[in-house]
Amino acid sequence: DNSYKVSGGLHGVGVSVVNALSEKLELTIHRAGKIHEQEYRHGDSQYPLKVVGDTNRTGTRVRFWPSAETFSQTIFNVDILARRLRELSFLNAGVRIVLRDERINAEHVFDYEGGLSEFVKYINEGKTHLNDIFHFTAAQADNGITVEVALQWNDSYQENVRCFTNNIPQKDGGTHLAGFRAALTRGLNNYMDSENILKKEKVAVSGDDAREGLTAIVSVKVPDPKFSSQTKEKLVSSEVKTAVEQAMNKAFSEYLLENPQAAKAIAGKIIDAARARDAARKAREMTRRKSALDIAGLPGKLADCQEKDPALSELYLVEGDSAGGSAKQGRNRKMQAILPLKGKILNVERARFDRMISSAEVGTLITALGCGIGREEYNPDKLRYHKIII
């Protein structure tokens, strides 16, 4: 009775569209002890649904051949199929999905007993994690909504939260993401307040700080979901936010209390993120400028060019003052600027903002380029040189 309690498809549009765009579509349905069959050509039924045999199985098989008249190519990309089927296997613990590519006689089997925990483990492979995976499922009897969440922090600086409703991904998030974020931030703030961490460290943390390095999967099963569009890229069911927030609040608060070591490691990362954010703010202030570059404020020795059009300007980054001197003598002053950089430059891909900003050479480079840094301030249109030669 509960087989179709929740569904990704809402109106049957999917199979109708596939049917219309297929040269041929075959339906084989095992139900109530009988095998039913029907065939379509370019969306038109070839005969009514008919019984073709007996069965003790249940289920539906859909086979379709994309129309060459509609599509310029009808070759399936096995990587795209594998990615989606792996995702479905993670989202439905214990379901075994087999993908066969008969073109090259290859088979992929997706079977994950751990469900969302294994999903997080798969995403975090190769990264250093700060805590064991936190995973819970909570079903609400009054509205039929089931909330499942798995999460883990790692040593990266990116947030990776993926949201699903009835197995369908929402790349734009929605009410389930809002509920998750609210509960996560509240739970961590309450923990750090109770442990006096914020007063001790003298920092103010934000939700973004809490989610730095976080990998999380938020999956909800909703009987009657509402989306912002047919593509289902954003969930708008208001009751889901409350359901996720309540379930996450309870389970996550308990997790932090029961795992003090993990809680301290997570709090430490959040404090570091808050400090880095503050350093980034200072960096943005440093690189803000109303018009031309204030050369007097540069810690380096930029020899600027006369050209004011960035499209015609070149910046040469050279190592040390001696190379800088030679470059200045040989340059075309009209369009070529020279910036000597001393010492070994910092690998900013692996360094935090606070470390990056403490490097005088990096600071010089940021100011000379003029396009700013950070999510809010970076503007490539303000780049002062369209050619940069290292």
Swiss-Prot record:
GO terms for molecular function: ATP binding; DNA binding; DNA topoisomerase type II (double strand cut, ATP-hydrolyzing) activity. Its EC number is 5.6.2.2. It is an enzyme of class 5 (isomerase). InterPro entries: HATPase_C_sf, Ribosomal_Su5_D2-typ_SF, Ribsml_uS5_D2-typ_fold_subgr, Topo_IIA, Topo_IIA-like_dom_sf, Topo_IIA_B, Topo_IIA_B_C, Topo_IIA_bsu_dom2. Pfam families: DNA_gyraseB, Toprim. It catalyses: ATP-dependent breakage, passage and rejoining of double-stranded DNA. Keywords: ATP-binding, Cytoplasm, DNA-binding, Isomerase, Nucleotide-binding, Topoisomerase. Belongs to the type II topoisomerase GyrB family. This is DNA gyrase subunit B. It comes from Acinetobacter lwoffii. The gene is gyrB.
